[in-house]
C-alpha cells in the first residue's frame, strides 16, 4: 500500500503548505472548511484497505492530519494537537479506518452498500445483530474486511449496532471510538485464533 500512501501524503503536504501561506488571510471557519475539504477526502479515500498495515506507514497519514490541525489552530510544530483533534471532532487515523469499516458493515446490513459486500459478511444472530466470525491463519488474511469487520461490529454496544439511521450510527460510533477505543479493540480480538 505504500505506492498509494506516499503520493497521497506528498500531495496533502503540498496543498496544506499552500493553505499555510495564506492562513493569515482566512478566518478560522474558512480555514477549517478548506483544510477539511483538501485533506479529509484524500486521507479517507480507500483508507479501510489500510487496516493492519505497518504502523510507520499509517504514521505518515497521522502526521498529515496533525499538520492540518496545526494550520487550523495556528499551533507550532512543537505543540501537541491532541486537544485540537478532539475539538475538531477528527478521529485519529487508526480510529478513522475502523470507523470506515464499521460504516461499511452498517451500510451492508441495511442495504446501502454495493451488493458485493453482502457476500463478505453473514449474520449469526438477527435479534442481537451479531455477525459470524471468520477464522483465518495468515496475517494477510487477518487484515481483510471479512475477518476484521465482524470482530469490530460484534464488539460495538447493541444500541449502536441497532441505530435507525446512518447519521445516528455515525454519530454514536464516532463518540464511542473517541471514548472507548482501547476497550473496543481488545474486545474485538479477545478470542483471536
Q: What is each stretch, according to the model?
A:
Residues 1-193:
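Hydrophobic/basic alpha-helical segments
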